[in-house]
From Swiss-Prot:
Annotated organism of origin: Rattus norvegicus (Rat)
Protein role: Endoplasmic reticulum (ER)-resident protein that confers cellular protection as an anti-apoptotic protein by limiting multiple stress-inducing pathways surrounding the endoplasmic reticulum and mitochondria. Inhibits the activities of the key sensor for the endoplasmic reticulum unfolded protein response IRE1alpha/ERN1 both directly and by blocking BAX/BAK binding. Modulates ER calcium homeostasis by acting as a calcium-leak channel. Negatively regulates autophagy and autophagosome formation, especially during periods of nutrient deprivation, and reduces cell survival during starvation.
Compartments in which it is found: Endoplasmic reticulum membrane
Residue runs in coiled coils: none
Protein name: Bax inhibitor 1
Gene: Tmbim6
Tissues and organs where the protein is expressed, per its UniProt entry: Highly abundant in adult testis.
Source organism phylogeny: Eukaryota, Metazoa, Chordata, Craniata, Vertebrata
KW Calcium (keyword) present: yes
Length: 237
C-alpha cells in the first residue's frame, strides 16, 4: 500500500480522551478569551505606536495592575461574567500599550523583527500548548518548583546587573527567560486542566495565565532578535 494514499484522521489528532468533556468545553472558553485578549492587546500596541493617544508609562502599568487586582477580587459567576470580561479586555489593552516602547525599538532597528517575533512566538506557544494537552495529565506539574527557582535566580541576577551593567548578563537573562516561559506554557496549561477537573471553571482568570505567558515570550523573543540584528549591523560597519 502506498503511504501517500493513506488518509489522515484529523478527528483522532484533535481527540483528547484523557480530558473530560466539561474540561474540554472549559478550555474552549479559555482559548476564545485568549484570542480576544490578543486582538485587544494588538489594538493597545497600535494606539501607542501609531496614534500616540495613550503612551506606555507608570500610569498605564498601574492601570493594568489595578484592573488585574479588580479581576482577582471579583468572584467568578454568571452575574459578574460580563463585568470580568470587560476588566480582562481593559487589562489586555493596557498590556498592549505597555509593549509599545519595545515595539518602537524593534521598528527603529528593523521592522521585519515584529512579524518574525510574532510568528515565532505563535509557533512556540502552539507547540508547547499541544504538548501539554496531549501529554499524560499532571506530567508537567513538577516543573512548578524548577520554574519558580529559575525566576528567582533571574530576578536576583537582574538586580545585580543594575550595578554591573553587563550586556552579556542581560542577554543571558533574555535567553534564560525565553526557556523559562516555554516551561510556564507547559506548566500553566496542565495546571488549568487540573483546576478545571477539580471544579475551578474560572476561564477568565485562567486565560490571563496563558496571555501573560504569550506576551512575555513575545517580548523576550523580540528583544533577542533586535539585539542580534543590532550586532549584525555593527559587524557590517
Amino acid at each position: 500500500m502506498n503511504i501517500f494514499d493513506r488518509k489522515i484522521n484529523f478527528d483522532a489528532l484533535l481527540k483528547f480522551s484523557h480530558i473530560t468533556p466539561s474540561t474540554q468545553q472549559h478550555l474552549k472558553k479559555v482559548y476564545a478569551s485568549f484570542a480576544l485578549c490578543m486582538f485587544v492587546a494588538a489594538a493597545g500596541a497600535y494606539v501607542h505606536v501609531v496614534t500616540r493617544f495613550i503612551q506606555a508609562g507608570l500610569l498605564s502599568a498601574l492601570g493594568a495592575l489595578a484592573l488585574m487586582i479588580c479581576l482577582m477580587a471579583t468572584p467568578h459567576s454568571h452575574e459578574t461574567e460580563q463585568k470580568r470580561l470587560g476588566l480582562l479586555a481593559g487589562f489586555a489593552f493596557l498590556t498592549g500599550v505597555g509593549l509599545g516602547p519595545a515595539l518602537e525599538l524593534c521598528i527603529a532597528i528593523n521592522p521585519s523583527i515584529l512579524p518574525t517575533a510574532f510568528m515565532g512566538t505563535a509557533m512556540i506557544f502552539t507547540c508547547f500548548s499541544l504538548s501539554a494537552l496531549y501529554a499524560r495529565r499532571r506530567s508537567y506539574l513538577f516543573l512548578g518548583g524548577i520554574l519558580m527557582s529559575a525566576m528567582s535566580l533571574m530576578f536576583v541576577s537582574s538586580l545585580g546587573n543594575l550595578f554591573f551593567g553587563s550586556i552579556w548578563l542581560f542577554q543571558a537573562n533574555l535567553y534564560m527567560g525565553l526557556l523559562v516561559m516555554c516551561g510556564f506554557v507547559l506548566f500553566d496549561t496542565q495546571l488549568i486542566i487540573e483546576k478545571a477537573e477539580h471544579g475551578d471553571k474560572d476561564y477568565i482568570w485562567h486565560c490571563i495565565d496563558l496571555f501573560l505567558d504569550f506576551v512575555t515570550l513575545f517580548r523576550k523573543l523580540m528583544l533577542i532578535l533586535a539585539f542580534n540584528e543590532k550586532d549584525k549591523k555593527k559587524e557590517k560597519k
